Amino acid sequence: MAYPIITRREFVTGAATVAVGTVLLGPNRLFGTVPVPDVSVVRGGSAAAATRRALELLGGMNHYVASGDTVIVKPNIGWDTRVGLGADTNPEVVKEVITMCFEAGAKKVKVFDNTCNEPRRCYQSSGIEAAAKSAGAEVEFMNENRYDQIDFPNGVRLKSWPVYRDALPGNRDKIINIPVLKHHSLPKTKSGKPGISLGFKNMMGIMGGNRGQIHNGFEENIVDFCTVIRADLTIVDATNVLRRNGPRGGRLADVEKLDTIIAGADMVAVDAWGVKTFGYEPDDLIYLSEANRRGLGHIDLSRVVTVEERLS
Amino acid sequence: MAHFQRWKNLRIGSQVFFLVVFFVLLWQARYPLGGPFPMDLFLRLDPLLGILLSIASRVVLLSFALSLIIIVLTLIFGRAFCGWICPLGTTFDVADHLMKSRAHGTRIRTRWWKYVVLIGLMVAAILSYQGLWFFDPLVLLDRTATGVILPWFWFLIKELFATTFNIPVIQNPAFGLYNPLAGVIIPLSQPLFLHSMSILLFFVGILALEKLHRRFWCRSLCPLGALLGVFGHRAPFQRTVKSDCNECALCRENCKMGAIHKDYDRTNRADCILCLNCAIICPQDSITFEFASLKHSPAAFDLTRRRWIGAAVAGVAVVPLIKTTRTTNQLSSRSLRPPGALPEDLFLNRCVRCQECVQVCSSTGGCLQPSLLETGWDGCWSPIANMRMGYCEYQCNLCSKVCPSGAIHKITLEDKQSRKMGRAFFDRNRCIPYDRMEDCLVCEEHCPTPEKAILFDVRETRRPDGTIADVKFPYVRLDRCIGCGICEYICPLPGESGVYCTRENEERWGQKTNIAFTS
């Protein structure tokens, strides 16, 4: 008999091993079909190409946006500064994201931000209004009479806060957060190094009220906020990175061109990659550790499945 | 008669047209500032402003060169400006109809007052004081429109929409209607002014005088009317009466300017504003308006020598009266002037309180406010920056672009971004990190200078609850701070801010600060 002989016991053990392995590791990794990483990091290339590639590596935009969806694209439009100074999100990234949303079948894409300087100035000089409109999105100024008070039942410090109505679940299907990686003195670090602004901080753009009060106890407040309002996809713009004098900046000397796009659905993992890109250890940022501790995502990058790629 | 009815319709059309243009131009004074016509067109057409400001500031102000058009028009047609163009005059006509006030064309005993006002202003201008900010009719309407009428109107519109935003079924279509207009036609943020009531009261007072008789202001108080009367009292185009007049007195009774002499034949061309009402009301059709040889004008100015001298003395007397009122240092130190403003005395001498700068500022940073007595009676309604109500946008120099009189010098954006309006101070009793020993840094976050003017010290601190923590304590770097006030505006404390701006270190146009700083 040329057949290999397996006993009944060997068969049962082997089958059980495969079954347990499948459950533990996930079928994709075991059988090598369509691996969808948690985070993709694309370096080099144009901002638009890098953004597109980052989404392709994550399985494409239709992995996140379904046909007929109403999508909120939330870039950072906080400041009345020129394109390239790293205070606002790169308009090319915003435009590419909107284009991909429509390719995935989105019915409507809305773009807005609660700005720090005068809204029209910010929308215009950031280049985002023009870019988003050219891609077919609706660009709106947020209206002070359209905020709803939202409760945060698991909030440690933040119990209730006004949030922009259009960004609330029920009024939209998906929310795509596009922060710009930059220096910001507010988020505390364990090491005492200057803080960094990323996806969590960018969520403040859909808050209303006296937002300055969020600053006292920022680390707890922002995590409390994201226990209820979470982005479905976060895309970090690390193309022009403001190293000093953030979050507003204004000097080209403070900007470093890193030409990097980081994308993923795990808000904590994406921010952690952003922090790493800035040159810090992820758990140095206190709000990230806090978010990780409360189960909003994964801070340990060794356990986050990441695909990195460099475009030429 | 029918002939003049057509002309009267044309006159009313002209009045409505210029009133609308006035408001459209004023509304156009907003970010991003554009449009083919200067928004201060009416002020530039005002010869009273041009002449008296030039005298008071000892400079020929060419920005008022357009007012020559009005002077030439007046030399030919008399005070046609007052009857056909002046938006304040039109406002009175509308108010008169609503209030049913009567012409009382025979009440003429107070009409010389306006020459006293003009002479007083002239004498004061020679002594380098301009009182135009109180008396000029176009400035008056500009100020009332900016400070009261437009904010009132926008509030009404915005509130109506805001109500619909909370009604489930119609909220989305209502917002869809509203949002394309927001920031384009409807201001994004509601203009709010601390002292708008004082502006309104002044305006209501003048309107109330209309109850005495029509066009009271124009007949008896308006210095621009007086000046145009001087230019136009021998105008060739005039009212003439044919010999078939039966002296029914209707024209004289119904003259809203009281310009018809009691012989019904002669007209006071220093007062006639060519409204044409007399030609229409005349049952005999004997009144017409035409170019005619110069007729004798009845005592056009009603000014005796005693009144001349009295007016001049009043002009001299009022200047020290106003100039010797001052406010406390504390109030005026919190009253920052717009960037590019002339040194204070020159500034007050040039600023006519038209509120063009306030209007344009309300569409962007929103810090400029008409003051009341913060800078003295002398500075009433002059623009001051209230940094708790708004702040000076780092990328904006629009106020300097709209100033019609040059009280705010036209400065470039680069100049503005390094020119100090004042400086920021931390109130360490109120500022959150000093008071609660908690991080805050909203001011540092917003500080717009490329290298931050607000920095912070990290110090290990014992908190009220006994724990030890690193706290970021903010401070100001004087050499970088331009006093834009965004820190004061954005401070999350309720009421008084934990950081505030004063005029210390300010750099007015043509004047650099001498204060040396070390940091």
Label each residue range with its predicted role.
Chain A
Residues 2-312:
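N-terminal and secondary-structure boundary signal
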